[in-house]
Amino acid sequence: MSSVAGSPEAPTARLARLAPRPLAAPSLSRGHTNALLSAAIAILFAATAFVADGGLRLERTTYVEIAYMGIGALLCAAALLLPRARSQRFHGAPALLAFALLAAYTAISIVWSLAPSDSWIESSRTFAYLSAFAGTMALARLAPRQWPALLHGLGLSCVVVSGWAVLTKVFPGALAEDETYARLRAPFDYWNSVGLTAAIGVVALLWLGARRSGRPAVSALAWPGIALCEVALMLSYSRGSLLALGVGLVFWFAVVPLRLRGAIVLLGASAGAAAVVGWAFAMTGLTTDELPLEVRADAGHELGALLLLMLVVLSVIGLAAGFLSAERPASPHARKVAGRMLLGLVVLIPVIAAIALAAAPGGIDGQVSKAWDRLTDPGASTPANTPDRLTATSSVRARYWEEAFDVHGVSPWVGTGAGAYATVRDRFRTGTLFVRHAHGYVPQTLADLGWAGLALSLLALGLWGWAAIRAVGLRPRERGLPWDAERVGMASLLAVALVFGVSSAVDWTWFVPANAVMGLAAAAWVIARPPLRRRLQDAALANAVPELQRSRAHGPLWAPRTSEPAADVAGPGAISVAEAEWRRGRRFPWLPAFAALLVCALALAAAWSAFQPVRAVHAGDAAIERLELGALDAAVSIAEIAHDRNPLSPEPLWELAFVEERRGRLANAQEALEEAVRTQPADAETWRRLGRFQLSTLNQPADALASFRAAYYLDPRNPASTSDFLEASRANGQPGAVPPATP
């Protein structure tokens, strides 16, 4: 063994590498750095919600995805280059690798996808999520002590989004003049995303109100914040979000030893929210669809007055509660008694529910069986958009899931391609409603990526779960370890991740960028931190590290020597471990620099790839504009450019065919339509457009009948499929023909 390795300074040198240092400018205090980072995170999450909304608008969503790719790459590059982050052990690497494999598999599915253009878009979305996940892990390495900033940012952004959603009720004339639904859905245009955002906000603000550290005035803001989020959640009528919030709260109160403080904040804020929600549910102007603007405005203004009163009262109560808890803290005996009372209340809830079920017709068995049948019945009707929806058990998810399993049967092992569910589902749907997602991560993944994709998802989930358990200290042997502020914060972030996970399991919130990045950021930070026992040991011994060694270990990327090396401590010719670490750290980090450059290059390539469908849409719009101006040759040229930018989509080919038809070049138009069919043969619309051209323009009823037959097979529930087939049949002299079951 060398003298360096055997030096008695080796443990100290290891601590020097592991001792965390906040990423802050010398002129900024830690509190100011936390405030700035909190504001930046809140702005990022809120901007994601308002710009990308529900993730269904291609251009706006793509811009958000590119932004996350860039931010994530820069954070990863900084973590690879800066010594204070590079010297740490790479915690959470297996989970990150599994996530990367899932993203790569999503992109590879384009090869066999039945809807390759949608698979391209979904691969870009997944790479953006991977960038957000990896970037958050890098930030946790760069600024390990700034974990409160993430919780602050989550809470603040959720309050902003929830507040905006509620304001659309308060001022419908200015913010939601054309709204027809009573349920809150702004800014996502999807009510369950509003509910999930509010649920995440409740958990993050629960930590803020229950924590022992921090400024009491800031902690008091948790009271009105939680109440506002709860009002938004309830007015969205989102049952899935309520379920997710319940799971998150049960986990938080079961794990975090701040139950009394948390219960006081949660119950107090919920009492204020319950009063407002109860009044709102009784108002026709707030709970009925398709009402005149005047009726909605009158009720909305009254709601605004009540909300303002609620916020003021809860702010005062929060300040008073914080002052009393600081001046007269509860004794250990009082906390123990209160904890038992809370436990008794929790136990009492299922008892009361069981009594109510037993008293209902059919008893417990009958009621449970009835609820289960409604929940799993594919033919169940959609519950009305009223407050009664919150207690209804029927759902159309069973229908979407059954259709997803039918799609999965087309290609069980590798799937039909990422995002192909929306296209292939038309073949199996039982109604005329168009649905893009299966409303559940598991059925959606089975349909799109098959058993292989689900296996990769479960692998990533399992590796993340194990790392999270170790980081929070949930193993039995770690329960007795101290609950410092960071451990409470990590448990709260884990609860946020659970809320998102439960919601995405029963809904399509995985595809909503703001919802996804909130949950992924919380999940990533947790596993980027060391296991609890190791972190506590390093924190306890970090003060023993000499300041000179800490400054060297966390010095700049590359600089000349600034002092003479220390004397030999292990015999003639040997050097100290600190000196060896210092000398090695001063050499330019070629390998990390290459890795950082590679990460940035991959992010740039992914961003450029994600932007191509948007560029294709722009070119297609320009082609139509040239056509309207009479510049037919230019329109054809630009339409071909659109196809070159997105060769996997049939839409540029449809535009090209339209322009060629206007030019009178029918053969070229037919060739473009046939190429669209070859590009996406599982899409009924490609066959339908080809058949319409063959029947109406080329007067080829026999060819049109064959095309319409394929369209009917792929989308039999579409009224256009039936009418087109019958029209082509009559043109072929077969007026009594019946649409076939197979092409």
What are these regions (language model features)?
Residues 173, 190, 382-436, 442-445, ...:
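TM-adjacent membrane-interface loops and short helices in multi-pass inner/ER membrane proteins
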Residues 55, 110-112, 159-199, 209, ...:
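Membrane-interfacial helix-loop-helix modules of multi-pass inner-membrane proteins that assemble, modify
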Residues 1-108, 114-121, 131-157, 207-225, ...:
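Transmembrane signal-anchor hairpin modules in multi-pass inner-membrane enzymes, especially those
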Residues 655, 689, 724-725:
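Canonical tetratricopeptide repeat
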Residues 647-648, 681, 716:
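Short coil turns that delineate tetratricopeptide repeat
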Residues 641-642, 675-676, 710-711:
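Canonical positions in the second alpha-helix
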Residues 256, 451-491:
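Hydrophobic transmembrane alpha-helices and their immediate junctions
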